[in-house]
């Protein structure tokens, strides 16, 4: 029995064009296959295109060329299906300071159309050790707590793929 591809990338290229003739090739014909159940990491120096690749998956950057396929769905033809299959934890912490972790997770679940009766907010808060801060303002959380809250937001819709950019930055060992 063959393993199913969770993620298949073929000849993925991203070129950033400046107004001048300077072009920056952030990704150049990237090919990658990640099988179901596999844990995979991207390593490389600053500016190697790791975050650009993750931003293409997240839909915040448009690829120049190539194919992105997630669980058999093509990004160009099924962007909503692809993005609902992925939980993204961005490198930058960007949370609304005046919402609580619980409220932020509830809002995120609502964006994915998850009915209130099916939401797992408290379970996720416990999983990332934020149950005691569930009703505090996000602005009162430490940097590591905010990072864990981003992980919780990425998991709220139970995606089969979790993509983390700099996942351990500012997070305590436990």
PLM segments and residue spans:
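Walker A (P-loop) phosphate-binding loop of ABC-type ATPase nucleotide-binding domains
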Residues: 45-48
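Conserved ABC transporter NBD signature motif
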Residues: 66-74, 82
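Conserved ABC ATPase "signature" region
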Residues: 106, 110-133
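Conserved ABC ATPase signature
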Residues: 137-141
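Conserved catalytic motifs of ABC-family nucleotide-binding domains
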Residues: 158
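Catalytic Walker B motif of ABC-type/P-loop ATPase nucleotide-binding domains
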Residues: 162-165
């Amino acid at each position: 029995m063959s393993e199913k591809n969770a993620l298949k990338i073929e000849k993925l290229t991203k070129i950033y064009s400046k107004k001048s003739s300077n072009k920056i090739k952030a990704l150049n014909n990237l090919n990658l296959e990640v099988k179901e159940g596999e844990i995979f990491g991207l390593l490389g120096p600053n500016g190697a295109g790791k975050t650009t690749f993750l931003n293409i998956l997240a839909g915040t950057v448009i690829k120049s060329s190539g194919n992105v396929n997630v669980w058999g769905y093509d990004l160009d033809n099924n962007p909503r299906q692809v993005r609902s299959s992925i939980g993204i934890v961005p490198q930058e912490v960007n949370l609304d300071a005046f919402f609580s972790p619980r409220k932020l997770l509830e809002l995120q679940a609502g964006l994915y159309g998850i009915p209130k009766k099916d939401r797992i907010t408290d379970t996720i808060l416990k999983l990332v050790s934020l149950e005691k801060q569930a009703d505090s303002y996000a602005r009162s959380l430490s940097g590591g707590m905010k990072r864990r809250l981003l992980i919780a937001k990425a998991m709220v819709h139970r995606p089969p793929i979790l993509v983390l950019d700099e996942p351990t930055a500012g997070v305590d060992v436990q």
